[in-house]
From Swiss-Prot:
Listed PROSITE patterns: GST_CTER, GST_NTER
Subcellular location per the Swiss-Prot or TrEMBL entry: Cytoplasm
GO molecular function, one term: glutathione transferase activity
Tissue expression summary: Liver.
PANTHER family assigned to the protein according to its UniProt record, in alphabetical order: GLUTATHIONE S-TRANSFERASE, GLUTATHIONE S-TRANSFERASE A2
Record organism: Homo sapiens
Statement: the UniProt record of this protein carries the keyword Lipoprotein: no
Family that this chain belongs to: Belongs to the GST superfamily. Alpha family.
Quaternary organization: Homodimer or heterodimer of GSTA1 and GSTA2.
Gene: GSTA2
Name of the protein this chain belongs to: Glutathione S-transferase A2
Gene Ontology CC annotations of this record: cytosol; extracellular exosome
Amino acid sequence: MAEKPKLHYSNIRGRMESIRWLLAAAGVEFEEKFIKSAEDLDKLRNDGYLMFQQVPMVEIDGMKLVQTRAILNYIASKYNLYGKDIKEKALIDMYIEGIADLGEMILLLPFSQPEEQDAKLALIQEKTKNRYFPAFEKVLKSHGQDYLVGNKLSRADIHLVELLYYVEELDSSLISSFPLLKALKTRISNLPTVKKFLQPGSPRKPPMDEKSLEESRKIFRF
């Protein structure tokens, strides 16, 4: 029996959460080795496990993979969540780059200066409502299918629904004008593997709070 993937990161969402989501949606059980101190991170670096001296790092299939996109690409390919041909893969890549653009803004929001947060939140709300959500609503409307690409579950659906949850935490009203996105969120959330991941006690991480922010500052020395 193959070993479970082992995820090396701190006990926060950060850049590992999309990896947790994708593995969970694929029905893959995984272990987490939490980095709890700067010394834990130094040990991984000194042992030569981090090619570019940074996490996330995932041990899978005899490899120690770093760089979030590389890890996600491997998982999506391995578990048939990356389209059936190069055209579908290109569409998936295009969609997830857009998802990542908005996701990055949300990811970095808690780390910004307090006096900047209101303006940055307003920018996220504006771009969500006027740029990103309309684009994905249009895709779903254009083909009338249940999923973004090829009428089959792909990583694009999973990453988008993860993003929808994050946006909902910031402003639950933003999705109200996008019925097809709401339907996609419900559809993906009801998949057995995703439903399990959304339950309390799963490896899914909560939003960043002051305590986890301070712990992150100590671990990553910023």
